[in-house]
């Protein structure tokens, strides 16, 4: 499947493809079979600077937008890889970049850009509150001294904990009964995962059939320094949407990459598979569903870039949901 010409992202596509060629199908099949993590692949993406695409240049990143980041994720999947192993670092940037203080950005971003730290995890979902985020029950109570928050509660389906140094955590700092709007009273924190595992956070891996590990988290009087609060207390729901909007768009791009991978593979196959003396690709009953899939992928691609345009312009993100679907 040829890309539209001219493609202003062609240089990015070519560079990512050159990297991905070094990790062929056999590599990703082995990782999947072993239920492992593509450590070498993620490290290569990090060293090449692709996972720091959205980090400003003054912090060691590339200073690119969501559109460029989405092309990176698309090409990873289009090459047969699994961007789900590392896309968290891309979309978690949205919350930190837009709402972190200058001091927080100076502390975290250079080390994330260099690969010294990984920010792959986001703690939002809870057992009884999946899509209705405003009903979360995990609490973060500020101590009497004011220098820390004490976290209690539970999260579920939290990915890449074992392969991340930091996690963005959403917790209630004001009870639901005390706020005027249910979207108020939640706050965002940066959590040092290695320290948290020693001082109040328990990780319980969940056996699953998806393409990456995921976990339950239990918090029992976990103390987080007050300086790890991102933005204003109580505004976390609004802040987390920046990360979630980026997440939806990046996953849409990955799905487009998957679709293009399948179209390319099936087109090659139906041209080679011969039945009754001719390739099966000459049968319209085979051609039609491939053509339909191609059309759907191209439509999704247009919606993806519309969503990127809105995000990068900091405009309302109503298009994001449709891009993800």
Regions found by a protein language model. Name each.
Residues 61-64, 131, 228-233:
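Cytochrome P450 core scaffold surrounding the K-helix E-X-X-R motif
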Residues 135-137, 195-225:
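Flexible, small-/acidic-enriched active-site or ligand-binding loops
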Residues 129-130, 156-161, 209, 246-250:
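Glycine-rich phosphate/pyrophosphate-binding beta-alpha loops
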Residues 147-201:
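A short core secondary-structure module
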Residues 138-142:
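A structural signal for short hydrophobic beta-strand segments in well-ordered beta-sheet cores
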Residues 115-124, 170:
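A short, Trp-centered hydrophobic/proline-enriched beta-strand micro-motif
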Residues 1-84, 91, 99-104, 115, ...:
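Alpha-helical interface subdomain recognition
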Residues 123-127, 152:
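Cysteine-centered functional microenvironments
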């Amino acid at each position: 499947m040829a890309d539209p010409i001219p493609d202003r992202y062609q240089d990015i596509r070519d560079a990512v493809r050159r990297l991905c060629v070094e990790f062929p199908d056999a590599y990703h099949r082995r990782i999947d079979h072993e239920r492992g993590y593509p450590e070498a692949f993620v490290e290569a993406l990090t060293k090449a600077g692709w996972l720091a695409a959205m980090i400003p240049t003054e912090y060691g990143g590339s200073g690119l937008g969501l559109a460029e980041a989405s092309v990176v994720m698309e090409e990873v999947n289009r090459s047969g890889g699994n961007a789900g192993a590392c896309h968290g670092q891309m979309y978690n940037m949205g919350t930190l970049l837009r709402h972190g203080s200058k001091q927080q950005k100076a502390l975290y971003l250079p080390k994330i850009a260099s690969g010294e730290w990984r920010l792959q995890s986001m703690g939002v979902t809870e057992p009884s509150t999946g899509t209705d985020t405003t009903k979360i029950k995990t609490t973060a109570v500020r101590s009497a001294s004011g220098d820390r928050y004490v976290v209690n509660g539970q999260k579920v389906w939290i990915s890449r904990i074992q392969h991340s140094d930091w996690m963005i955590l959403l917790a209630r700092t004001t009870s639901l009964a005390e706020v005027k709007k249910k979207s108020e009273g939640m706050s965002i924190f940066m959590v040092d995962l290695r320290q948290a595992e020693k001082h109040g956070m328990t990780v319980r891996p969940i056996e699953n059939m998806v393409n990456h590990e995921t976990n339950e988290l239990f918090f029992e009087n976990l103390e987080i320094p007050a300086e790890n609060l991102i933005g204003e207390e109580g505004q976390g729901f609004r802040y987390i949407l920046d990360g979630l909007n980026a997440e939806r768009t990046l996953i849409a791009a990955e799905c487009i990459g998957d679709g293009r991978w399948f179209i390319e593979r099936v087109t090659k196959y139906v041209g080679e598979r011969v039945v009754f003396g001719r390739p099966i690709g000459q049968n319209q009953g085979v051609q039609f569903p491939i053509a339909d899939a191609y059309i759907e992928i191209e439509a999704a691609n247009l919606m993806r870039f519309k969503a990127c345009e809105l995000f990068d312009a900091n405009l309302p993100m109503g298009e994001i949901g449709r891009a993800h679907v």
